Structure formats: structure tokens, C-alpha cells
């Protein structure tokens, strides 16, 4: 079920919200939580019901394993059990996400012809696996004692963040499900949440889905792009990805706020970054936080000398790359960001101050080149697009074949301008329910209805991860 689908907007969200607050209105706290959990699992099962078994089994096993970890006194036994828990979660992720990739590459390497059926990737497995990694690791440290099972299940399955984040941390979310003040309907949270949700909806259906037309046309013919088309294609995808994923995150934050649950901000105008380190403070913030806390710091962070620090950066972003998908393109994308951060760190040691505008341009160009690997379906296609972008792949003077519709070029320009406006969570801080904001919400709703009727609804890009 998509946030931008008729089923979600007309039935699922209003029914779930209404029943939840009615139950809490009459002091039925636990039935309210059970209702929200059941609805969240129904939301997940809409895609493929069979994988309910996977997520429910995983929740039960990880909860009780984490609680047991808190109370194992023998350090050696606790460490062994901790490793078993991590490997159990990792093995499930490896099986579903990487088996076909590994078999294909082994066949290529060893000249074998082993054939296995295509394994369907369970929705959101990368996201809820990361959450459980964090929970198990913190349980190993003795930091999750006394967690309630129902609250834990809601932490994992709460539908706004379940499918594609933001990647929430148990320390931030579970106390909110225990807070009595969060159980009652809050007009301020509701109007702010609705406002953020509508802004995210417009980002998705009016901007991201429009730029998808340009990006898909270009990458669908990656080996025959002109110089102009290759740049238009790459920029269109950079805009599409930002508005698609940040739009989803805004809709998730808004939907969470309808239930008085505050989810973390995931984007903070990343294309305004003046260096790559700044970019990762602004782009997919919750993923960056997770990689830092559970990969980079355990490796030693920056505490064990400069050489190991640079190595830790590379390893962290290689993990981040392969987390996104089972393809060499994602590994190369992760390598490019790790390498870029290494270069940035070495540059800082020169004490040479780069003008912000120069840093902004260099960062945008580098990130855009890296996105080519992120989007392309193969390394060969990515290299073909990059060759065209540097004038080596086709007629450098050829006009655009991608912008075939007259409205697409103005849309491209509009999207570039919108990148530099305030984020919906920033706008929400200034939000006060008055006539002006009511008018904004009515206009956003009308625009949303117009686009829902005129443009085919696309899946969110991060559903594939």
C-alpha cells in the first residue's frame, strides 16, 4: 500500500486514526496499541501477506533474545550469544537480498551454470534489520532492560516508518508509545502532521513522478545518449530521487505526527551542502547516524590514527553502498562516497579554505556523478552515461531527445529551484493553524487530487532497498 494510493488516503489512514483515538479516549490503552499494531501489519501485508510470517517471527525472536542478552552475566557467554543474534539477523538479510547476486557472480567467476529461482526481496527488510541490529547491540550493552513486548513490536512495525524509514532508534520511539500524553488527540500535532504529509505528497506525485519520466527515458537508453541528454538524465534523476525519498520521509513524519509520534528528520536540504561531509549530515540523516554509531565507531572511528580513520570511512561507506542493493553499482557508489570523504578529510589538513560557492558546485557535481552508478542497472550502463557526460559517448552538439514533451523543460527548471526552498519540517516549525495555512492545505489537497488523477502512481524508489 502506497502513501499516495487511494486505498491509503481514503480508507486506511482515516479508519486507523479514528479507531485508535476512540479507544484511547475511553482509556483502552493496550487495545489501542494492539489496534495500531494490527493495522501496521495489515499495511505491510498489503504487498505480500506471506512475509508477515518473516517480520512477526523476527520481532518475537529479536525481542526475547535482546531481553535475554541484558541479563547474561558471564561476559564470554553474553558475547557468544550476541554474535549468534547478529549472525541470525544477517543471515536472513543475506539470503533474501544477496543470494541471487552471489550465485550470479560465482557462476561468472567459476564458469559454472548454477541456476536458482529468483528470490523475492521482502519489503523493508533492510530497514527493519538495521533497527534490530541496533536493538540487539544495545541489549548487549544492557541498555534495553524492561522493554515492553507490545511497545517493541510497535517500534518495529509502526506503519509510517516501516517501509522506507526514517530508520528509527528504539531509544527515541519506544518511550513515546509509553507516554500517556501521546494517547489523546492533539489538534496542533494533527494539523502540523497533515500539513507535512500534504507537502510530502506533492513532492512525490507532482515533482518526483514527473522527473521520473525524464530519468527513466534517459536511463532506458543509456548507451545512446547525447552529451545534453546525459546531463539532463543525470540531473533529472538526482532531483527525482531527492523529492521521492524526502517526500516519502515527510509523509512518514506527517503521518507519525497524526498519532502524536515524532519521527526523526531525514533530510535537511542536502543539495545545499558545500562539501561531502556536510552532504552526509543532510542526506538520509538516519542512515548516516546508524552507520556512524554501529559501523564507524565500533571499527575505531577516528581514535586509532589517521590511516585507520581513513580505512574506517571506506569500510563504512562500502557497507552503506551494499546495504542499498545487491549490485556492483551500489558498491561503486559507496566506494565513491567513501573515497570522497577520505579526500575531504585530507584536504582539511591543508588548512586551505575553499569558497562556499566553489565547494557547493564541486559537491553537487561529485554527488551527481555518483548517482549515475546508484541509478544505472549495470556498471556498463553507468559508464556509458558518464562517457556521454564528459563528451566521449556521442555527439556533443546533439540536442535533447529526452525532453520530448514541451512541459518537461520548465519542470526541470522548477525542480532545480525547489531544491533550495525550506524543508517541510522547517515549514512546520513556523506553522500556525490560521486562514492562510488552511488555504495552503486546501491548495495542496487540490493539487494532490489533480496529480493523483492525471499521473500514474509510482512506487517510492527506496521500496527496492
Predicted features and spans:
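Membrane-interface capping segments at transmembrane-helix boundaries
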Residues: 422-429
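Membrane-embedded transmembrane alpha-helical bundles that form the catalytic cores
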Residues: 1-415, 429-464
Amino acid at each position: 500500500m502506497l502513501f499516495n494510493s487511494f486505498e491509503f488516503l481514503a480508507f486506511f489512514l482515516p479508519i486507523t486514526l479514528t479507531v485508535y483515538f476512540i479507544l484511547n479516549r475511553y482509556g483502552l490503552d493496550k487495545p489501542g496499541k494492539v489496534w495500531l499494531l494490527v493495522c501496521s501489519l495489515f499495511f505491510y501485508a498489503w504487498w505480500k501477506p506471506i512475509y508477515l510470517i518473516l517480520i512477526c517471527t523476527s520481532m518475537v525472536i529479536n525481542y526475547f533474545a535482546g531481553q535475554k542478552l541484558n541479563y547474561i552475566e558471564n561476559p564470554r557467554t553474553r558475547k557468544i550469544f550476541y554474535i549468534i543474534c547478529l549472525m541470525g539477523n544477517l543471515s536472513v538479510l543475506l539470503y533474501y537480498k544477496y543470494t541471487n547476486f552471489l550465485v550470479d557472480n560465482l557462476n561468472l567467476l567459476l564458469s559454472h551454470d548454477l541456476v536458482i529461482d529468483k528470490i523475492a526481496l521482502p519489503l523493508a527488510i533492510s530497514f527493519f534489520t538495521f533497527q534490530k541490529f541496533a536493538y540487539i547491540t544495545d541489549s548487549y550493552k544492557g541498555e534495553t532492560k524492561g522493554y515492553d513486548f507490545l511497545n517493541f513490536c510497535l517500534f518495529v512495525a509502526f506503519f509510517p516508518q516501516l517501509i522506507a524509514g526514517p530508520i528509527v532508534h528504539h531509544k527515541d520511539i519506544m518511550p513515546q508509545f509509553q507516554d500517556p500524553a501521546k494517547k489523546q488527540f492533539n489538534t496542533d500535532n494533527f494539523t502540523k502532521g497533515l500539513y507535512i504529509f500534504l507537502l510530502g505528497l506533492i513532492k512525490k506525485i507532482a515533482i518526483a513522478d514527473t522527473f521520473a519520466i525524464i530519468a527513466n527515458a534517459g536511463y532506458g537508453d543509456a548507451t545512446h545518449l547525447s552529451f545534453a541528454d546525459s546531463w539532463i538524465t543525470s540531473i533529472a534523476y538526482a532531483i527525482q530521487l531527492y523529492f521521492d525519498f524526502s517526500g516519502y520521509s515527510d509523509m512518514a513524519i506527517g503521518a507519525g505526527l497524526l498519532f502524536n509520534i515524532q519521527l526523526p528528520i531525514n533530510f535537511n536540504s542536502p543539495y545545499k551542502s558545500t562539501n561531502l561531509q556536510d552532504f552526509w549530515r543532510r542526506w538520509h540523516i538516519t542512515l548516516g547516524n546508524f552507520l556512524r554509531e554501529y559501523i564507524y565507531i565500533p571499527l575505531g572511528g577516528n581514535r586509532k590514527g589517521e590511516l585507520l580513520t581513513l580505512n574506517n570511512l571506506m569500510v563504512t561507506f562500502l557497507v552503506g553502498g551494499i546495504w542499498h542493493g545487491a549490485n556492483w553499482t551500489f558498491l561503486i557508489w559507496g566506494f565513491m562516497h567513501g573515497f570522497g570523504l577520505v579526500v575531504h578529510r585530507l584536504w582539511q589538513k591543508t588548512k586551505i579554505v575553499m569558497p562556499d560557492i566553489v565547494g557547493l558546485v564541486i559537491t553537487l557535481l561529485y554527488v551527481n556523478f555518483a548517482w549515475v552508478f546508484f541509478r544505472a542497472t549495470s556498471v556498463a550502463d553507468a559508464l556509458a552515461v558518464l562517457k556521454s557526460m564528459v563528451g566521449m559517448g556521442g555527439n556533443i552538439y546533439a540536442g535533447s531527445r529526452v525532453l520530448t514533451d514541451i512541459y518537461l523543460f520548465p519542470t526541470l527548471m522548477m525542480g532545480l529551484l525547489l531544491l533550495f526552498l525550506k524543508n517541510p519540517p522547517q515549514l512546520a516549525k513556523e506553522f500556525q493553524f490560521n486562514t492562510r495555512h488552511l488555504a495552503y492545505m486546501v491548495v495542496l489537497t487540490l493539487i494532490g487530487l489533480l496529480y493523483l488523477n492525471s499521473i500514474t502512481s509510482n512506487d517510492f524508489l527506496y521500496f527496492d532497498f
